[in-house]
Swiss-Prot record:
Record field: catalytic activity: 3-methylbutanoyl-CoA + oxidized [electron-transfer flavoprotein] + H(+) = 3-methylbut-2-enoyl-CoA + reduced [electron-transfer flavoprotein]; pentanoyl-CoA + oxidized [electron-transfer flavoprotein] + H(+) = (2E)-pentenoyl-CoA + reduced [electron-transfer flavoprotein]; hexanoyl-CoA + oxidized [electron-transfer flavoprotein] + H(+) = (2E)-hexenoyl-CoA + reduced [electron-transfer flavoprotein]; butanoyl-CoA + oxidized [electron-transfer flavoprotein] + H(+) = (2E)-butenoyl-CoA + reduced [electron-transfer flavoprotein]
Native source species: Rattus norvegicus (Rat)
Entry EC no(s): 1.3.8.4, 1.3.8.1
Modification N6-succinyllysine, positions: K56, K65, K76, K260, K316
Pathway terms, separated by semicolons: Amino-acid degradation; L-leucine degradation; (S)-3-hydroxy-3-methylglutaryl-CoA from 3-isovaleryl-CoA: step 1/3
Gene3D superfamilies per the UniProt record, alphabetical: Acyl-CoA dehydrogenase/oxidase, N-terminal domain (1.10.540.10), Butyryl-CoA Dehydrogenase, subunit A, domain 2 (2.40.110.10), Butyryl-CoA Dehydrogenase, subunit A, domain 3 (1.20.140.10)
Feature: transit peptide: 1-30
Record function comment: Catalyzes the conversion of isovaleryl-CoA/3-methylbutanoyl-CoA to 3-methylbut-2-enoyl-CoA as an intermediate step in the leucine (Leu) catabolic pathway. To a lesser extent, is also able to catalyze the oxidation of other saturated short-chain acyl-CoA thioesters as pentanoyl-CoA, hexenoyl-CoA and butenoyl-CoA.
Pfam families for this protein: Acyl-CoA_dh_1, Acyl-CoA_dh_M, Acyl-CoA_dh_N
PTM sites of type N6-acetyllysine: K56, K65, K76, K239, K260
Gene Ontology CC annotation, any one: mitochondrial membrane
Protein's UniProt name: Isovaleryl-CoA dehydrogenase, mitochondrial
Length: 424
């Protein structure tokens, strides 16, 4: 049965998130879920229900753990939670029904990314790496045997997926990668490493880019994509990285020492990996833009109620004009970002995928999320600066989106070059 039926057929009832305890003078009611006006956002009834269903689930099962996950840099129940996401049908949200997917679009994918990130941006990032960077790449580029072998377990949550592209000296300049894949009989032998790999310590299945021709000119012609399993001989992971933000979304270095990968595990064709890579980047940037949306909404969830509980000079601080200005700035940034992201997602669902706007949505939402997080800290004053409140976590998490998946500088280059190409 299609998982879309499981996902969208649930009855949605109203709920209210239990407020997080505060150790200070602000009452516990200071945190509540703010309503999202999806009539303005242009969502249909199924999309509204999708948001409500996922929001209810993650606010009950993930949000109360978000601070602990951040502080310990560990999500102890990751595997169990992943299977719950699988049972909801959201891990393979864009995958075909025949493999257990929900067969929905990129707008729905963004909505789920947003709501998970609203509860925990770190877990939202891991979800994006699994559902888009890994699953969607196999859906778009895998052959039938690969899809039948890998997709069902990735979609159910039995397996965790990742994508490995970056290296210590090949981040934005990804085609300069040095991970080498040499063909020997019916296998390829991989030697080298990958770095900053989201889900790396946990992944069972990884989409890995390697050089099958180190002398190719241009260098992009020598790249091949492989599907690598964690138990393949010669593959290992280094210790988990201790990051500024997105803590609990596990990241590490991957090590390939004479790692044997069957030739049957080539994703697409030999030396055609750059096409897999570049076509996937546009949709990666779009889906990941849901992360900053969720962070901004979480900031508002904590900030707006706080401003109407905290008192100074004999009145609620939300009554001061400067604080009203902060509220207006945060809200309008979020709403402008939502409209841009949702409209680009709709266009992609209709087959109109543009690198310029996929880069644009992650550029704009990432930088707005950082500013909204800073504004939220300012609104809470001293409480915003201590770790009893989550405001610092929002800022640290938001900053990742200006760096990961292509930096803000690279996104500006993508947009600028697109305009220049129109005038050649």
């Amino acid at each position: 049965m299609a998982t879309a039926v499981r996902l969208l057929g649930r009855r949605v009832s109203s709920w209210r998130l239990r407020p997080l305890p505060s150790p200070l003078a602000v009452p516990q009611r200071a945190h509540s879920m703010l309503p999202v006006d999806d009539d303005i956002n242009g969502l249909n009834e199924e999309q509204k229900q999708l948001r409500h269903t996922i929001s209810k689930f993650v606010q009950e099962n993930l949000a109360p753990k978000a601070q602990e996950i951040d502080q310990s840099n560990d999500f102890k129940n990751l595997r169990e939670f992943w299977k719950q996401l699988g049972s909801l049908g959201v891990l393979g949200i864009t995958a075909p029904v025949q493999y257990g997917g929900s067969g929905l679009g990129y707008l729905e994918h963004v909505l789920v990314m947003e709501e998970i990130s609203r509860a925990s941006a770190a877990v939202g990032l891991s979800y994006g790496a699994h559902s888009n960077l890994c699953i969607n790449q196999i859906v778009r580029n895998g052959n039938e045997a690969q899809k039948e072998k890998y997709l069902p377990k990735l979609i159910s949550g039995e397996f965790i997926g990742a994508l490995a592209m970056s290296e210590p000296n090949a981040g934005s300049d990804v085609v300069s990668m040095r991970l080498k894949a040499e063909k020997k009989g019916d296998h390829y032998v991989l030697n080298g490493n990958k770095f900053w790999i989201t889900n790396g310590p946990d992944a069972d299945v990884l989409v890995v880019y390697a050089k099958t021709d180190l002398t190719a000119v241009p260098a992009s012609r020598g790249i091949t994509a492989f599907i690598v399993e964690k138990d393949m001989p010669g593959f290992s992971t280094s210790k988990k990285l201790d990051k500024l933000g997105m803590r609990g979304s596990n990241t590490c270095e991957l090590v390939f020492e004479d790692c044997k990968v069957p030739a049957a595990n080539i994703l697409s064709q030999e030396s055609k990996g750059v096409y897999v890579l570049m076509s996937g980047l546009d949709l990666e940037r779009l889906v990941l833009a849901g992360g900053p949306l969720g962070i901004m909404q979480a900031v508002l969830d904590h900030t707006i109620p706080y401003l109407h509980v905290r008192e100074a000079f004999g009145q609620k601080i939300g009554q001061f004009q400067l604080m009203q200005g902060k509220m207006a700035d945060m809200y309008t940034r979020l709403m402008a970002c939502r409209q841009y992201v949702y409209n680009v997602a709709r266009a992609c669902d209709e087959g109109h995928i543009t690198a310029k706007d996929c880069a644009g949505v992650i550029l704009y939402t990432a930088e707005c999320a950082t500013q909204v997080a800073l504004d939220g800290i300012q609104c809470l004053g001293g409480n915003g600066y201590i770790n009893d409140f989550p405001m610092g976590r929002f800022l640290r998490d938001a900053k990742l989106y200006e760096i990961g998946g292509g930096t803000s500088e690279v996104r500006r280059l993508v947009i600028g070059r697109a305009f220049n190409a129109d005038f050649r």
